[in-house]
């Protein structure tokens, strides 16, 4: 019987996460005119409930070991929760104001920032080629952001970009937590609860009543978010970022397809050039890292 390698499992899970997060964006946009903080709260609430049910089941089967937080993990749980919240809020704000594909590609700057934060947190080396790829990918993102003196016009794309920064830090934190053997469901519960708490002040002062349809759309978004979170946590548990991060870009394909089918969205020329630059740099970095590792193993 053929044994599936951890890298193959990581690739499978990262593509699953890309699909779920692209579909989540569709449901968030279909929910209509609701403040992005309120949307984020419901997204996290559903993910929290699903993760909590799984944790209670683990607790019943494995006892207190299922909920124990390893020594040294608390700092990185907070870091993952804060960074993930920045990622969610930035992404949700962007989804409401720009093309799904634009929001997705700027959010997919995350793998480049994962490399940077893995260097800072895990002391994984950044070699010259990946560093050049990061710089050129950043220049590609500028074509999508389209800097101007009109802050209102730029804000959604900047929010999407900062969402990518936050997601990159969150992924690096997940990798560190995997080394510390922290339960993946605990990571999701901690993040979801933290992000929900950040939303509470807004909900107390400015809650918008929702229709049954809007509630249903946000519940679907939350279910997709939970699927995405479980998948990305599993992916970085099974394999390091430098082996699987390239496959995260499959979300661009899903988002472009969903944006066209559901909202008749077509990216402009500058954005398309930006997509090509960022994805090309991701492919170059992946091939370089893969060849470097194979050369090391064959020595």
Where are these regions (language model features)?
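Transmembrane alpha-helical segments that form core, pore/gating elements
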Residues: 26-29, 34-36, 51, 149-210, ...
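C-terminal transmembrane-helix exit sites in multi-pass transporters
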Residues: 110-135, 253-272
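Helix-helix packing/entry segments at the starts of transmembrane helices
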Residues: 103-109, 177, 181-193, 229-260
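Hydrophobic transmembrane alpha-helices of multi-pass small-molecule transport proteins
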Residues: 129-146, 270-289
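Hydrophobic/small/kink-forming positions within alpha-helical transmembrane segments
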Residues: 18-22, 52, 81-89, 111-116, ...
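Loop-to-transmembrane-helix transition segments
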Residues: 9-17, 61-90, 155-163, 203, ...
């Amino acid at each position: 019987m053929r044994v599936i390698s951890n890298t193959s499992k990581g690739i499978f899970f990262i593509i699953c996460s890309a699909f779920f997060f692209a579909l989540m964006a569709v449901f968030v946009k279909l929910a209509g005119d609701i403040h992005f903080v309120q949307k984020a709260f419901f997204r996290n609430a559903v993910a929290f409930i699903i993760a909590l049910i799984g944790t209670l089941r683990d607790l019943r089967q494995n006892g207190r070991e299922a909920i124990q937080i390893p020594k040294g993990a608390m700092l990185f749980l907070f870091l993952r929760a804060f960074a993930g919240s920045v990622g969610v809020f930035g992404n949700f704000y962007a989804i409401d104001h720009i093309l799904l594909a634009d929001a997705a590609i700027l959010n997919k700057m995350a793998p480049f920032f994962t490399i940077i934060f893995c260097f800072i947190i895990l002391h994984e080396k950044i070699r010259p080629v990946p560093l050049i790829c990061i710089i050129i990918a950043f220049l590609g993102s500028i074509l999508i952001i389209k800097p101007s003196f009109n802050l209102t016009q730029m804000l959604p794309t900047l929010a999407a970009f900062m969402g990518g920064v936050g997601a990159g830090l969150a992924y690096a934190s997940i990798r560190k937590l995997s080394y510390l053997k922290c339960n993946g469901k605990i990571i999701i519960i901690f993040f979801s609860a933290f992000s929900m708490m950040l939303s509470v002040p807004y909900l107390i002062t400015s809650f918008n009543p929702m229709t049954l349809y809007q509630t249903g759309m946000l519940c679907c978004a939350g279910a997709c978010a939970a699927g995405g979170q479980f998948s990305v946590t599993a992916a970085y548990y099974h394999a390091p970022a430098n082996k699987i991060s390239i496959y995260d870009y499959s979300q661009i394909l899903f988002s472009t397809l969903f944006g066209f089918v559901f909202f008749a969205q077509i990216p402009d020329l500058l954005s398309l050039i930006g997509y090509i630059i960022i994805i090309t740099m991701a492919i170059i970095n992946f091939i370089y890292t893969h060849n470097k590792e194979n050369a090391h193993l064959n020595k």
